Structure formats: structure tokens, C-alpha cells
């Protein structure tokens, strides 16, 4: 009886008329990231057949008029590609290519820019991001506590001296022993940041939902400052020590970088303000990105060189 009900629900919901000549796409992930990926793929001219998601509460509902189907119904659709638009891409990839027997050449992961809402390509957002980073650098440089530019922020400064236009957040790292200091420091300094940028900001603390390599459930994963007026964030990632590496977890990955990069720091200039970066930052970038000097707009999480992928506890 259950199978008949599911079949009836599928027949009722899946009424899409394919558009000849267009690549037929299923988007796996019906969260906010799915919204952004939908816009990106519609703009590219793709024919979006359906969403799919593991959240049963969403099954046979619709997003933007597009049906959200259970994963086990995908075999009933003739699609060209499934695009994973979720931070849990590693688990979903294994689910699709293993449990659901989807051909690997039909499964792709949305690149980082497709998963984002606002980017720094908007001049007013770029101006605010630069202003916020300058404030951070000035304040942190006087704190006598270590910090390091990280991720796309470090990559942009090392390559061109500026933020990457298609990025949408500012990334820094701190060490686990300094997490309490920076949490309190930012909490008390938030009014100053709002005055400096003439914007509203909120602060949030993301905790590990599962114990992992060297962190325990409930320990701080990152501090996130969100600009409520221009919809971008500044993230302080907490790195935990697992000799001889400093590590953190995100998007189904464990990122590990050698302790030599954090024993001290180098400096880069950001619009006249000194910015602390990992020691030997060029080799740090080599280990993270490979050929980091060449711009790659369509960057996927699978492209990182300093990660191990895991299946299990889901921490963004």
C-alpha cells in the first residue's frame, strides 16, 4: 500500500515537460544552497527537472514550483546530471553512486560560487567587506594574540592584494587556546564594529555537533560575524592541535595544516594595514590549493589538497 501511495504522489507531483536541447538537471539539496544553485543553473540555461533531498518532510512538496522528490524516486527520471548543492556533498555523493547506483559521470558538485547568495562582485558589498577586514586587522594586531588570514581571504591577498570578487565571506583562523579570548573580545567590541562600518552586525558561535579527530561535541568550531545589511560574514575558524597539524572540520572534510605554519606568522599588506598570515604562507597555499597563482572561479570542495573526507557526523 505504501508503494502505491508513493507512486501516486510521484505521478501527481512530477509533471515536468522536458525542454528539448537543454541539459536536464536534478538538484540534490533543497535548502538555501539549493535556492542559490537553482538561480545559477537557470541563468546558464539548464532544464531543472526536480529537486531531491533526504529530508522526508520535504518530499512531494515544491520549491519555486519544482517538485522535491525522495532519492529513491530518481531512477524514474531521465536526467543528464545530478548537481549536489549541499554542504554534505561527500555523503550524498556516496549515497548516489553507491546505494542508488547513479553513474559517477552523471554526478557533479556545485562549485563554491554557485552555493552562495551575495558575493563581493557587488561594489557596495566589496567596500563593506574591506572595511570590516580593516577593522578586524587593526583590532587584532593590538590584541597580542595570534590570528591568521585563511581560505579565500588569504588566497586573494597573496595573489592580488585584495579580496576575491566572487567570494562572499572573510576567513580567519585562530588556535584553540585563544578561542575564549576572541569570543569575549568580539562580543564586547561589536558596537565598535557597527559604528566603524555603519552597519548592523550579529555574532554567533557554531559548535561541533559530533566528537571528532581532537575535538569534542559542544566545543567551539567557529565564530561568525554576520553583516545584516549586506548579507556577508566574517568567520574565525578554530583550529585544534593534532600533532603535528592544526586541524578543523567543515563540509564533510577535515582540513589539516602543518604546525610550522602557526608557530609564528608572516605579514601581508591590506590597504595600508598589516595582515597576519601563516608562516611560509606560499607553501601553505601550495598545500591547500596546488597552483594557487592561477585564478579558478569554479572551485569545488573536492579540489582542496589538504583534506580528508569522512562520512558520519555532519558539521558544516
What are these regions (language model features)?
Residues 39-40, 137-170:
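Active-site nucleotide-donor binding segment shared across nucleotidyl transfer reactions
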Residues 1-78, 83-118:
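Hydrophobic, well-ordered beta-alpha structural blocks that scaffold small-molecule cofactor pockets
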Residues 227-316:
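Catalytic cores of NTP-dependent nucleotidyl/adenyl transfer enzymes across multiple folds
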Residues 161-182, 272:
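Catalytic metal-binding acidic patch
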Residues 125-132, 173-215:
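Metal-dependent nucleotidyltransferase catalytic core
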Residues 30-34, 56-57, 87-90, 153-156, ...:
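Short, solvent-exposed loop/turn segments at secondary-structure junctions
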Residues 18-19, 103, 107-149:
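Helical scaffold of the NTase/Pol beta-like nucleotidyltransferase catalytic core
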